[in-house]
């Protein structure tokens, strides 16, 4: 996800970017994950009515990771993270998240922790929007038997026998499944939705990528990186970079 985000940022700022992926599918571990994003005090949380501040989040990070991470890195994360989410929201039509309420901070009992959590997750997306890129998205490793649900919905449906909210969510999921069969929609959630939304936005921006292409080495000139050497289809290729190279190593 970070590599896609970096390339998309370049595209949105007027640069021409090119992603290489050593595997045959895009997404990596992010596509197989829950897709949750933990960035305190972002605008999605604010819109959901979550009361949070930079100071509270900093207190939580200090209580959980202490001095194992440099202060400048913690400060940058807490400052630039919300800016990143706002940037993608304002400059794309498809990168959208929602608050995953009650996904508690892992150490909610520590100073600055939130029992209701700070996590957000990608909204469900119809993969048909990706068109020819859909087939390049990494397949999930666990089947949900036709049901597509967010992490928040999963939490609610697990309470189906105990709460009205659980029953209502179950009905919502069933309706979504029937609707998808009727319309041909191919919904994705969690990590696949995260990668799909990044990929769709990258595609709309004019970005390009190439799969089955492995990084081999940097091309150097006077101690500067000016490109990369890659291996693709048994051939070694040299790709020049005018503005820089970013490694997305997962």
Over which residues does each language-model region extend?
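N-terminal Rossmann-like FAD-binding beta1-loop-alpha1 element of flavoenzymes
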Residues: 1-19
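Conserved N-terminal/central alpha/beta ligand/cofactor-binding core
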Residues: 22-208
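Acidic, glycine-rich active-site loops and adjacent beta-strand->loop/helix elements
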Residues: 23-25, 215-219
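Glycine-rich, N-terminal phosphate-binding loop of Rossmann-like dinucleotide-binding domains
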Residues: 41, 249-250
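A conserved beta-strand/loop element that lines the FAD pocket in flavoprotein oxidoreductases
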Residues: 202-217, 238-240
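Short, hydrophobic/aromatic-rich segments at coil-to-beta transitions
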Residues: 223-229
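Core beta-strand elements of the Rossmann-like FAD/NAD(P) dinucleotide-binding domain
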Residues: 233-244, 248
